[in-house]
């Protein structure tokens, strides 16, 4: 702006009414600096305004040495020591700075207030940021930000490295130029001085006032405007670039939240260095001798080399090397026996514990009870004897029941268990009824094993019979006392004394003959002396002192088992020790289950069954075999272990038996060629396991060298469609004992022509199978001699052929009979007579002494003097 009143005055003014005055050169204020991670700091800031120096063009000449003064920082604070009245000097000096107007002061105060408010907000935001970082979400956010910061720092480091590399190249070029300059300076020192001065202060640099610092406007961004006098053009001067800062040290160690928030940049050990140190320490430790670890190695009956090495924590190569020293060439997967494994383990310094697969059954049975916890129990009495000697009738009389009428054919074919209460003592007695037939030997043996007392029933009119002797042997094998009950004394031909005498031959000496065996004469029909029999049983039980613990887990024996279509597998169990309760987990043979229901012999549902109580148990997975021992286990896992072991043993046993019987294919074919043995295929289904066992035993006895009964499948339960399919494949017959075929199975059998036979008496079944097997036997051929004839002359007839004229020398000759042609006592032909004529008539028979003509079928080599022997062959059917 130009003042029209004073054209020569260069003083700036805002309005014509006011003159500009020079304000104090230094202004003080406070500024709050913000650092990373929420740190702030309040500092005092001094601001120096720019001084404008007016005048003509020549006035700039004295200001030329200003750069030399600008390099000294001492005169920076010189204006502060000036008195305030220096600003009121006359305008003759020509230098007057403008003062701020009221609007500018207001705007400046408002800007400072806004800056303070902004600083306060930034401080609060930093505190909130710090609190957020301390929280869980803040920590995660901080980790992400730290990762971004690491990325940016890495990029910045790369950029600075590139910048440093570029500057190093420039510096090298500069040094090369300085060396050239030094060479030139040796020739022209004045020129070098001028060059140095020109380098320190470029020509045309702005003149600075003595009181203004050289870096007063270093913070200003952008080019500075410098006046060069009236009429001088202002040109921008670019600020010198700051020198490159050294690249920050490489971040070492893992960057965590703590290191990211820490203010100090601490140099730490790198992760790679730490890992190298750890590896060195491990290497030193591996060189040290290790202490041998002695382990307890569990060795089963058979074990692989790999498994043995794993259990010993040894290398399998070492185990193989030891075996090779013993002369055994083995692989890592080979199986060795327990003795070899024990030798290897002991040689390597380990202790050995031998186990067997049968160890799973340890603690299952025969647990010794404490004598203080035992209580008296009821005796178990087994009634044994020959068939039709009145065993079941005697039990019916004791139980006041009628079981005999329910048995097919009036004979007992099932083993039964019942409880009877003694009328005098009120104590219960458990009776087991066994079949007396020869087929039920296994049932009688089972009854003898679980019993305490054996009642041997002998008919007074029949005496000792084969099954009576067998029952005596079972009782002796079980080492149980015997009470002889001589039944049917009501008959007229009863001879009790003969029975007592016959028993002496088999080691049974009754008390009346000086022995210790009790005998009672009873009559089941008239109920004679039944109370005396019960009294003798109770007395014998007192002598045995039968006691057991009722609170222990139950043990027992499966008397009988069957597969009921409505109830599933049902087992008749005699509890021998402990108490069996509903819900117990039980194991019997290869079958397991949980007790769902307990049913007494009277059909009453029970919640528990104590010792000597026979019950039907529902809940098995499958029907167990009769005679299996039953036990209660603590868990299903233990039950599965026991049953899997028993099933494995059962499979191995059956496989070995089958392989032993079958042999090789060549042996079987040669046997068929030599013996011509035939099989009679059968599928047998029975109601209970005991009956099935008796049937199989009886059929095995029917086999001979020529024919045998081949049992394709035998099981408990009804006849199913799978049985019919199996029978169709092998052309077998199906036999059902006290069972029936399902509706679908019966229809399939009728459609495919499969024969199904039903039986309820075991002897009828055995007899029919015996007849059918007899039909497979080759019949017996028997020759009957008829007579001999001598050939007198041989005639050749064109229509008939050669005809021999003969005389019957012995017996008779019949047409159609078998003949032999004997020449010189050698049979040269066997065949049949085709023609027998006497004179010209065909006759059926020619008697001795008569002449006749005979011709053979398909044979004509006959000569005079040959003898014709005539005989008849009879076929006789064989039977087993």
UniProtKB/Swiss-Prot annotation:
GTP binds at residues 385-392, 433-437, 487-490. The keyword GTP-binding applies. The keyword Nucleotide-binding applies. One of its GO terms (molecular function) is GTPase activity. Residues 115-183 have a biased composition (Basic and acidic residues). Residues 1-251 are annotated as: Disordered. Transmembrane segments: none annotated. It comes from the Bacteria. Residues 433-436 are annotated as: G3. One of its GO terms (cellular component) is cytosol. Residues 58-79, 184-215, 233-250 have a biased composition (Low complexity). Its main location: cytoplasm. Residues 487-490 are annotated as: G4. Residues 376-547 form the tr-type G domain. Residues 410-414 are annotated as: G2. InterPro entries: EF-G-like_DII, EFTu-like_2, IF2_assoc_dom_bac, IF2_II, IF2_N, P-loop_NTPase, Small_GTP-bd, T_Tr_GTP-bd_dom. It is found in: Cytoplasm. NCBIfam families: IF-2 (TIGR00487), small_GTP (TIGR00231). One of the essential components for the initiation of protein synthesis. Protects formylmethionyl-tRNA from spontaneous hydrolysis and promotes its binding to the 30S ribosomal subunits. Also involved in the hydrolysis of GTP during the formation of the 70S ribosomal complex. This is Translation initiation factor IF-2. The gene is infB.
């Amino acid at each position: 702006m130009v003042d029209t009143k004073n054209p020569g005055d260069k003083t700036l003014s805002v309005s014509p009414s006011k003159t500009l005055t020079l304000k104090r050169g230094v202004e003080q204020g406070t500024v709050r600096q913000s650092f990373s991670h929420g740190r702030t700091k309040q500092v005092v800031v001094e601001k120096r305004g720019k001084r404008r120096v007016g005048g003509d063009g020549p006035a700039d000449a004295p200001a030329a040495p200003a750069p030399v003064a600008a390099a000294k920082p001492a005169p920076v604070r010189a204006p502060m020591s000036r008195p305030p009245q220096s600003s009121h000097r006359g305008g003759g000096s020509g230098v007057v700075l403008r003062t701020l107007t009221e609007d500018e002061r207001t705007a400046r105060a408002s800007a400072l207030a806004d800056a303070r408010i902004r600083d306060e907000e930034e401080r609060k935001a930093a505190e909130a940021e710090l609190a957020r970082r301390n929280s869980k979400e803040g920590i995660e956010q901080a980790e992400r930000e730290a990762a971004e910061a690491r990325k940016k720092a890495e990029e910045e480091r790369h950029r600075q490295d590139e910048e440093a590399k570029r500057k190093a190249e420039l510096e090298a070029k500069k040094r090369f130029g300085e060396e050239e300059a030094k060479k030139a300076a040796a020739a022209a020192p004045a020129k070098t001085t001028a060059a140095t001065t020109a380098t320190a202060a470029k020509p045309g640099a702005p003149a600075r006032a003595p009181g203004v610092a050289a870096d007063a406007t270093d913070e200003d961004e952008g080019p500075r405007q410098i006046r060069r006098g009236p009429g001088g053009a202002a040109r921008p001067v670019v600020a010198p670039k700051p020198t490159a800062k050294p690249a920050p040290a490489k971040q070492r160690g893992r960057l965590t939240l703590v290191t990211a928030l820490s203010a100090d940049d601490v140099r730490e050990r790198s992760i790679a260095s730490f890992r190298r140190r750890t590896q060195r320490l491990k290497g030193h430790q591996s060189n040290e001798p290790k202490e041998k670890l002695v382990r307890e190695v569990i060795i089963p009956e058979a074990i692989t080399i790999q498994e043995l090495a794993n259990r010993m924590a040894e290398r399998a190569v070492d185990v193989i090397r030891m075996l090779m020293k013993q002369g055994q060439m083995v692989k890592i997967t080979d199986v060795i026996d327990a003795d070899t494994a024990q030798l290897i383990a002991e040689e390597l310094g380990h202790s050995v514990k031998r186990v067997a697969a049968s160890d799973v059954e340890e603690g299952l049975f025969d647990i010794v009870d404490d004598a203080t916890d035992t209580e008296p129990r009821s005796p178990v009495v087994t009634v044994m004897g020959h068939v039709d000697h009145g065993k079941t009738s005697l039990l019916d009389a004791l139980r006041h029941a009628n079981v005999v009428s329910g048995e097919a054919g009036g004979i007992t074919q099932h083993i039964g268990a019942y409880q009877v209460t003694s009328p005098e003592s009120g104590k219960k007695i458990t009776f087991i009824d066994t079949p007396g037939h020869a087929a039920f030997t296994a049932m009688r043996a089972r009854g003898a094993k679980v019993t305490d007392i054996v009642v041997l029933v002998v008919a007074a009119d029949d005496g000792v019979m084969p099954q009576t002797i067998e029952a005596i042997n079972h009782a002796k094998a079980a080492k149980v006392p015997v009470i002889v009950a001589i039944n049917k004394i009501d008959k007229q031909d009863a001879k009790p004394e003969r029975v007592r005498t016959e028993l002496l031959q088999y080691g049974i000496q009754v008390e009346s003959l000086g022995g210790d065996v009790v005998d009672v004469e009873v009559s089941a029909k008239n109920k004679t002396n039944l109370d005396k029999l019960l009294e003798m049983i109770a007395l014998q039980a007192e002598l045995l002192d039968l006691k057991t613990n009722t609170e222990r887990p139950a043990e027992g024996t499966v008397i009988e088992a069957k597969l009921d279509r409505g109830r599933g597998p049902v087992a008749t169990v005699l509890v021998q020790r402990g108490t069996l309760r509903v819900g117990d987990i039980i194991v019997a043979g290869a079958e397991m289950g949980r007790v769902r229901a307990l049913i007494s012999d009277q059909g009453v549902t029970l919640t528990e069954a104590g010792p000597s109580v026979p019950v039907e148990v529902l809940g098995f997975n499958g029907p167990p075999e009769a005679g299996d021992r039953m036990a209660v286990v603590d868990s299903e896992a233990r039950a599965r272990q026991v049953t899997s072991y028993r099933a494995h043993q059962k499979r191995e046993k059956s496989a070995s038996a089958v392989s032993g019987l079958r042999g090789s294919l060549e042996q079987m074919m040669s046997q068929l060629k030599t013996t011509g043995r035939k099989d009679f295929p059968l599928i047998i289904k029975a109601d209970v396991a005991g009956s099935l066992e008796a049937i199989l035993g009886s059929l095995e006895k029917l086999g001979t060298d020529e024919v045998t009964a081949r049992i394709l499948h035998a099981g408990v339960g009804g006849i199913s469609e799978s049985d019919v399919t199996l029978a169709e494949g092998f052309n077998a017959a199906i036999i059902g004992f006290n069972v029936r075929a399902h509706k679908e199975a019966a229809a399939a059998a009728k459609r495919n022509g499969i024969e199904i036979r039903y039986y309820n008496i075991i002897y009828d079944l055995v007899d029919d199978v015996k007849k059918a097997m007899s039909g497979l036997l080759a019949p017996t051929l028997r020759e009957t001699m008829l007579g001999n004839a001598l050939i007198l002359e041989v005639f050749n007839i064109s229509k008939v052929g050669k005809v021999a004229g003969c005389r019957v020398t012995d017996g008779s000759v019949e047409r159609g009979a078998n003949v032999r042609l004997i020449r010189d006592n050698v049979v040269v032909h066997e065949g049949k007579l085709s023609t027998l004529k006497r004179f010209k008539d065909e006759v059926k028979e020619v008697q001795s002494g008569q002449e006749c003509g005979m011709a053979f079928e398909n044979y004509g080599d006959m000569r005079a003097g040959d003898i014709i022997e005539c005989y008849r062959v009879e076929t006789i059917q064989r039977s087993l």
